[in-house]
């Protein structure tokens, strides 16, 4: 079937004939889009800051919205709700429902009645034949057969028509990846800014109506009508012609709506806002073409900037804060764990400051645990120190005795010597006889010999030490002041160097550089480092931290809170419906009736301007399978009403025929002898049959008719007659008489054959 065979509707022809020759002036009624920057080409003005226009997109903030939406700053579980909102399933189901409804509603009653009569003729069945065959003595049986015959035709017709209409629906695809009126882009604009920039495309001369852009299709591309193979069905059903005509008209109309609009890309459009006139204008940054802007949620002007009424505007701050916390935690992990920093705190002995002298004396004296009694020099120095602390000359005897006890051990013990002999320091004293041990004699000789020599030397030595300690106390204070100044200068130098390093770091460098990469990494200087502070440590300084402890700020609670914010914001803003199981676990997130009205209605009526859309789908229909959707739509159309009426009339015709047969047989004579002979031959009890409306009682009074016109005879039929007539044996089926009721009135056939 070609496009020329698709004739316009009669009402459109009548409207065209009535208005032919009459000039109709169309008034430009203001649309909602006109308040958002839609202007005719002759009224376009120059967009500039002097005219009060402010660029509201692209800005760093609006581009950040898109980055957040794409997961550039992290992704949480709650953000997955946006995938359910962005799904085009609801829009596709709405388009399919529209095409199905418009197509099936185009059915004509005359065509449907012809198809039904054709079916009866092909089966060789009529209402009179059904009544004669199955309704002679059981009306219910005949009615049941008639209903089953119509149900069979109803089911086969429904399957054929739905397959036929589904092929028409397949001509239009709303999920094209290169579609200009993409539903996904429409949702992205709403989530980011709450407004949708778009362009109205003009049809090129000679272009073919196609669901894609207005363009001339190649010769090898099949036409729109070739999507439907109507040869078989159109030759068998009268109703197929009207369905095909109306179905293709619905597809062409939707194709024209989608091909005449283009939702502009997020990264290729400049949006300007005029606060005084409350207008928004969109301009393509590559072509310079101007478009209009559908404002779904009005933005707010604040101090020279615009606050958008959108989910991303409300949640952007929390996303940035959580992202900064995660970056901080990553830097802490890199700086405090890997690489390892080693802090060295040992100083040389000669560079340890004023306290070194006392420590050296302690070392020489052997007071330390590691140097206790380890060398003869330390014991000698200890002897000198002890001699300095003497209060009188007599204490030298005890000092020398203790020194000799530590050093000589048993070297001089055992032998005796006469100390009265010359050489033991007793020449000037009165000689005393007697021998003394060698050790005691040596001790006495040493004491007498070194007493005079060391006393003056030791006094002068410790006097010098006291003078040095007094002088070094002032130098120690000056040294500490200089060290504090040097520490302060080093801190300033470190801050300046860090600022210079941060400024030289590339913005795109990753903070998660590999450990040990050193200055080559994006963080700069994260290699292994040895910090030498030996020259900075004081006498009582020590290593406070070796940087081996792992410290990472916890951000799990913040991430969970951000996930809940995403979930609540998207569900409540777009009115989505959460489906859970009996345990309260989430199964899916789907469109509700409110979200369908919020999102689908502006898309089809304001963006696509589809005027013959019909009712919006419900949330149950949005997620049905294609077959279930077709069956549900089939029951809502006028075709179903026509089929119900045909079924009712056909059953009524069968009942009418049964009543006519019963009234005819009521007047026929009955031969009781012949019936009795048949029963005797079979040897079985006879089965009694009554006219409709007669009582079964054997009483003669019960056999009398209600009109009082005498008695009616009971008819007896043999089993052979029951077999010949094809009556059912089941008593529940064959016995449906109305006890004590009047005969069923005749139904006249008001429907022409």
Swiss-Prot record:
GO terms for biological process: chromosome organization. Its main location: virion. Pfam families: Herpes_UL6. Residues 454-475 are annotated as: Putative leucine zipper motif. One of its GO terms (cellular component) is host cell nucleus. It comes from the Viruses. Residues 1-44, 498-523, 668-753 are annotated as: Disordered. Keywords: Disulfide bond, Host nucleus, Viral genome packaging, Viral release from host cell, Virion. It is found in: Virion; Host nucleus. Belongs to the herpesviridae portal protein family. Forms a portal in the viral capsid through which viral DNA is translocated during DNA packaging. Assembles as a dodecamer at a single fivefold axe of the T=16 icosahedric capsid. Binds to the molecular motor that translocates the viral DNA, termed terminase. This is Portal protein. It comes from Equine herpesvirus 1 (strain Ab4p).
């Amino acid at each position: 079937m070609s496009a020329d065979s698709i004739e316009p509707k009669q009402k459109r022809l009548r409207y065209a004939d009535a208005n032919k020759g009459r000039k109709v002036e169309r008034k430009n009624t203001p649309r909602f889009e006109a308040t958002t920057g839609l202007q005719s080409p002759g009224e376009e003005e120059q967009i500039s800051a002097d005219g009060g226009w402010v660029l509201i997109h692209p800005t760093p903030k609006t581009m950040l919205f898109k980055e957040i939406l794409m997961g550039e700053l992290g992704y949480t579980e709650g953000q997955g709700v946006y995938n359910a909102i962005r799904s085009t399933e609801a829009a596709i189901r709405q388009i399919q429902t529209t095409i199905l409804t418009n197509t099936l509603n185009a059915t004509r009653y005359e065509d449907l009645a012809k198809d039904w009569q054709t079916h009866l003729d092909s089966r060789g069945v009529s209402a009179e034949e059904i009544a004669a065959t199955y309704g002679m003595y059981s009306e219910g049986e005949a009615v049941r057969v008639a209903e089953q015959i119509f149900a069979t035709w109803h089911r086969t017709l429904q399957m054929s028509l739905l397959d036929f209409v589904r092929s028409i629906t397949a001509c239009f695809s709303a999920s094209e990846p290169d579609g200009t009126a993409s539903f996904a882009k429409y949702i992205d604009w709403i989530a980011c800014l709450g407004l949708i920039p778009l362009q109205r495309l003009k049809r090129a001369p000679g272009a073919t109506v196609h669901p894609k852009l207005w363009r001339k299709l190649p010769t090898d591309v099949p036409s729109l009508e070739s999507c439907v193979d109507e040869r078989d069905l159109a030759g068998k059903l009268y109703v197929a012609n009207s369905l095909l005509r109306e179905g293709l008209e619905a597809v062409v109309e939707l194709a024209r709506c989608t091909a005449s609009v283009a939702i502009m890309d997020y990264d290729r459009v400049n949006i300007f806002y005029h606060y005084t006139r409350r207008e928004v204008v969109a301009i393509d940054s590559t072509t310079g073409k101007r478009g209009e802007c559908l404002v779904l949620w009005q933005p707010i002007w604040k101090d020279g900037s615009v606050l958008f009424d959108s989910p991303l505007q409300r949640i952007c701050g929390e996303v940035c804060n959580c992202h900064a916390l995660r970056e901080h935690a990553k830097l802490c992990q890199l700086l405090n764990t890997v690489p390892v920093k080693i802090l060295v705190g040992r100083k040389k002995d000669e560079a340890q400051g004023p306290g070194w002298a006392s420590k050296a004396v302690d070392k020489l004296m052997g007071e330390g645990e590691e140097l206790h009694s380890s060398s003869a020099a330390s014991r000698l120095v200890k002897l000198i120190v002890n001699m300095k602390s003497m209060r009188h000359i007599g204490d030298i005897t005890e000092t020398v005795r203790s020194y000799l006890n530590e050093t000589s051990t048993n070297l001089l013990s055992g032998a005796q010597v006469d100390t009265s002999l010359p050489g033991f320091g007793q020449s000037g004293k009165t000689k005393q006889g007697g021998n003394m041990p060698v050790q005691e004699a040596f001790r006495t000789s040493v004491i007498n010999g070194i007493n005079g020599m060391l006393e003056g030397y030791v006094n002068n030595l410790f006097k010098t030490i006291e003078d040095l300690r007094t002088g070094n106390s002032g130098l120690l204070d000056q040294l500490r002041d200089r060290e504090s100044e040097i520490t302060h200068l080093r801190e300033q130098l470190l801050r300046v160097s860090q600022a210079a390093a941060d400024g030289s770091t590339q913005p795109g460098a990753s903070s998660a550089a590999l450990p040990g990469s050193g200055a080559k990494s994006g963080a700069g200087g994260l290699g292994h480092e040895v910090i030498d502070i030996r020259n900075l440590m004081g006498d009582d300084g020590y290593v406070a931290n070796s940087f081996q402890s792992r410290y990472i700020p916890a951000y799990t609670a913040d991430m969970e809170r951000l996930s809940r914010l995403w979930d609540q914001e998207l569900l409540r803003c777009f009115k989505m419906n959460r489906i859970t199981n009996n345990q309260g676990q989430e199964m899916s997130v789907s469109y509700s009736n409110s979200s369908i009205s919020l999102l689908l209605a502006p898309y089809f009526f304001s963006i696509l301007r589809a005027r013959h859309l019909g009712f919006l789908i419900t949330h149950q229909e949005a997620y049905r399978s294609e077959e279930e959707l077709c069956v549900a739509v089939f029951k809502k159309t006028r075709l179903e009403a026509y089929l119900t009426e045909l079924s009712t009339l056909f059953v009524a015709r069968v009942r009418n025929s049964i009543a006519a047969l019963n009234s005819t047989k009521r007047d026929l004579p009955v031969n009781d002898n012949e019936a009795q002979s048949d029963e005797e031959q079979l040897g079985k009890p006879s089965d009694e049959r009554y006219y409709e409306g007669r009582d079964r009682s054997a009483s003669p009074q019960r056999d009398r008719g209600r009109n009082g016109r005498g008695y009616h005879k009971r008819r007896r039929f043999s089993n052979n007659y029951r077999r010949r007539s094809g009556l059912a044996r089941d008593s529940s089926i064959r016995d449906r008489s109305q006890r004590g009721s009047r005969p069923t009135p005749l139904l006249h056939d008001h429907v022409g054959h």
